[in-house]
Structure formats: structure tokens, C-alpha cells
Amino acid sequence: MIEIKHLCKSFGDKEVLKDISAVFENGKTNLIIGQSGSGKTVLVKNLVGLLEPTSGEVLYDGRNFVTMTKQEKVMMRREMGMIFQSAALFDSLSVLENVMFPLDMFSSMNLKERIHRAQECLDRVNLIDAQKKYPDEISGGMQKRVAIA
């Protein structure tokens, strides 16, 4: 569960978030909507730890993100993800290679294990048949599912 309490975020004199409180329960889908420039992205970046609040708290299962050790933050971030408005895929890599990219960079798996893991992820989002295609060959919705995988 993620809970935010009295969250405020400012950039210099500009207050972007003011006294926001909310609870995001595990297993539930939440929607954050608002006008352009209303602070949605700043809020989400605070939720996933890409920004730290000016004041207030962001709690993960009751633990304050700001007071976590670097290792605790790394472990917490492994449990969450964020998909940007554009899917942020590499145009020069196939769907499979895009999914494998973080494994290539940050895991000690061998090539066979990385391919297998990436194919499992693609299967979960019903894109196993698109693994050899490139981002410009699939729909925007499919690109988002690649980003999820």
C-alpha cells in the first residue's frame, strides 16, 4: 500500500502540490486525472521516488520513503513501475530486445535466461507473436503493453 500524507512539492517559489493526501491500496487500479500542468506527473514521480517531497510523507506499507536506506529504496522500486505517455521504446530494437534491455543492463542472467524471461513477460501481455516486430510496426496500445512487459 502507498499512502501520501499532506504531500507538498515546490520548485523554487512555485508550489506544484499542496497538502495532498491519498491511499493507493495493493491490487487496486487508481486513476490520477487533471488538467495539463496540474501536477499529475510531479505527484506520480513523488509516489515512485523519482522526486522527494518538499514536505509531507510518502509511505510504502507504513515506511517513509525519505528515511529508507538506498538498498531499501532499490528493493521497493523493484515492486513498482511507471509507464510514460509515450511508450519510450527503442526504435532500433525489436519488441523482444526492448523487453530484454533492462535484463541486459542490470541482471546477471545469461542470454538464454534473459530471452526466456522476456518471452514470459511478452506472453503475459499477449504479445509473444509480436516479439520480432519493431515498435513502428505495432499499434500504440501494443507499444504500451511492451513497456509494461
Where would I find each of the regions flagged by the language model?
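The feature captures the beta-strand-to-loop junction immediately N-terminal to the Walker
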Residues: 33-35
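Conserved ABC ATPase signature
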Residues: 134-138, 142
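Helix-to-loop junction immediately C-terminal to a conserved catalytic motif
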Residues: 48
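Conserved ABC ATPase "signature" region
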Residues: 63-64, 111-129
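Conserved ABC transporter NBD signature motif
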Residues: 56-64
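Short coil-to-helix segment of the ABC ATPase nucleotide-binding domain corresponding to the Q-loop/switch region
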Residues: 93-101
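ABC ATPase NBD coupling module
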Residues: 65-81, 105, 111-112
